[in-house]
């Protein structure tokens, strides 16, 4: 393999790696947003449950 071929191949490999890293970061960001949304929903549910329990205890 000539040096030109190798450098061309390396160039395309680096381009592909960059695109894969970008896609990975996008997916991780979406996963993180969904995770935080789910955690907030759970926290809200627990706070509501806590409020209901406190009302029952105070009766």
Swiss-Prot record:
The keyword ATP-binding applies. It catalyses: ATP + H2O + 4 H(+)(in) = ADP + phosphate + 5 H(+)(out). One of its GO terms (molecular function) is ATPase-coupled transmembrane transporter activity. One of its GO terms (cellular component) is proton-transporting two-sector ATPase complex, catalytic domain. The keyword Chloroplast does not apply. This is Membrane-associated ATPase epsilon chain. Sul-ATPase is composed of six (or maybe five) subunits: alpha, beta, delta, gamma, C (proteolipid), and possibly epsilon. Its EC number is 7.1.2.2. To E.hirae NtpH. InterPro entries: ATPase_A1-cplx_e-su. It comes from Sulfurisphaera tokodaii (strain DSM 16993 / JCM 10545 / NBRC 100140 / 7) (Sulfolobus tokodaii). Keywords: ATP-binding, Hydrogen ion transport, Ion transport, Nucleotide-binding, Translocase, Transport. GO terms for biological process: proton motive force-driven ATP synthesis; proton transmembrane transport.
């Amino acid at each position: 393999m000539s040096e030109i071929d190798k450098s061309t191949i390396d160039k395309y490999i680096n381009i592909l790696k960059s695109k894969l890293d970008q896609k990975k970061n996008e997916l991780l960001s979406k996963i993180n947003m969904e995770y935080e949304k789910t955690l907030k929903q759970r926290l809200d549910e627990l706070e509501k449950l806590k409020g209901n329990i406190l009302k029952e205890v105070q009766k």
